Amino acid sequence: FKFYIMKAKILTFSLIIIFVSNILAQNGEGNNWIFGTNAGVSWDCSTVTPVAFGGSPLTTNEGVATISDPSCNLLFFSDGTLVWDANMVQMPNGFGLTGDASSTQSAVIIPKPMDPNTYYIFTVDDNLQSGGLAYSRVDMTANGGLGDVDPLEKNIPIFNPSPEKITAVNHANGTDIWVIVHEWGNANFRSILVTSAGIDLVNGYVSSTTGTPHAGSSGI
């Protein structure tokens, strides 16, 4: 019985690897992962074989976000509080973001549609802490092309409190992006629309109710 369980786990893990590899082959923006203690894994655009690398300054047990260009070159990464460039050096203004290194999904990074030089870091603080959900803009023309966080568009609050979960998906129009988070204490998902015009925090979000309320260990 244990043998069959182990075989099932191996098969499941193998299918996940194949699925992830196929996704990465289609979009180089997710081809570099940095996590844990100084660890990283990279997929070249021409292959689905991962290559391990070290040297990152990161030390964390929880969430990290990375972003690469369509040619699979690492651009920058963040643990929700600090931001490092492709050379593993902290950006000049890449500090003090209101996420948390102890947040399970501390940040997600997305490109601004139709603008190859602008990215947004959406951060979620540790459960129910004051940072909540916020965003900061990264200008890739700054810092000699290595990018920097725009001090005039940094830690822009969206809502609070928020849980530690966040994700992003493409809009059905193939251009825009939805950033999705769960609200605290209810069953609402909040979807924030990012377009070529930027982020509309007044009219650019949809609230959907489904599932069970998120209220700590008794929720999702």
For the regions a language model picked out, list residue spans one by one.
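Bacterial Sec-dependent N-terminal signal peptides
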Residues: 1-30
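Structural signature of eukaryotic scaffold interfaces centered on beta-propeller domains
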Residues: 26-27, 59-73, 98-117, 158-176, ...
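Beta-strand-rich domains and repeat architectures in extracellular enzymes and scaffolds
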Residues: 26-78
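Structural motif
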Residues: 39-47, 83-87, 127-139, 186-193
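Blade-loop segments of beta-propeller domains
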Residues: 60-63, 74-132, 148-155
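Beta-propeller fold detector
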Residues: 92-95, 145-158, 200-211
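Short loop/turn segments immediately following beta-strands, especially the blade-tip
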Residues: 137-148, 192-201
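Beta-propeller domains
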Residues: 173-220
